[in-house]
A protein has these predicted regions:
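Terminal recognition/anchoring or ligand-binding modules at protein termini
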Residues: 19-52, 66-170
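Membrane-interface interhelical connector segments
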Residues: 56-63
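Cleavable N-terminal signal peptides
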Residues: 6-7, 17
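Short, linear, compositionally biased motifs with a strong N-terminal bias
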Residues: 10-11
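Positively charged n-region of N-terminal signal peptides that target proteins for export
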Residues: 1-4
């Protein structure tokens, strides 16, 4: 009897969490141009954390690999995805990647390793479907990979104010 009650309780608490993730991912898949928010949400969801897309972006922004002029709603490019994955999952690469750690050489490394198609432009804005496929492919090819700790302990000042405002409204 206790096992049945425990199973029912788990069902009531676990299913809504997965349905929220599934609905968010479905929304991402339908987009013509995925944003930093979408990419960040996929990374954080893969890490097993539960968050909103903006909370995920704020967490990923702490790594310092997103371009400074871009906003959370800016379309994400293949070059930016490559740079985030190579730098923050501490993947090794060739001489130019090791020397510069630049987004362009991150993209070149991943393209040379077969991650991106040969005809893929580094500045191509990824659709939601392409972003989900890229993140899934990355974790399928690297099942034991671990994200490094963010070098910044807190969210940027602008994002911190927005997060606190959001919490006050709840």
């Amino acid at each position: 009897m206790r096992k049945c009650i425990a199973c029912l309780l788990c069902l009531f608490f676990v299913v809504p969490v997965f349905s929220q993730t599934a609905s968010t991912i479905s929304e991402i898949l339908e987009k013509d141009a995925a944003s930093y928010l979408d990419f960040s949400y996929l990374i954080v969801a893969e890490a097993g954390m539960d968050s909103t897309p903006f909370e995920a972006y704020t967490w990923c922004e702490r790594f310092g690999t997103f371009p400074l002029g871009d906003t959370p709603d800016s379309p994400i490019t293949a070059k930016t995805v490559s740079h985030f994955l190579m730098k923050n999952y501490e993947l090794g690469g060739g001489l130019m990647w090791s020397a510069t750690q630049s987004p362009r050489y991150a993209w070149k490394e991943m393209k040379a390793n077969g991650f991106w198609r040969k005809s893929f432009d580094p500045d191509r804005q990824l659709s939601g479907r392409e972003t989900v496929q890229a993140v899934s492919k990355f974790f399928d090819e690297n099942p034991d990979i671990v994200l490094r700790e963010p070098p910044t302990a807190a969210a940027s000042h602008d994002n911190r104010a927005l997060l606190l405002q959001d919490k006050e409204e709840e």
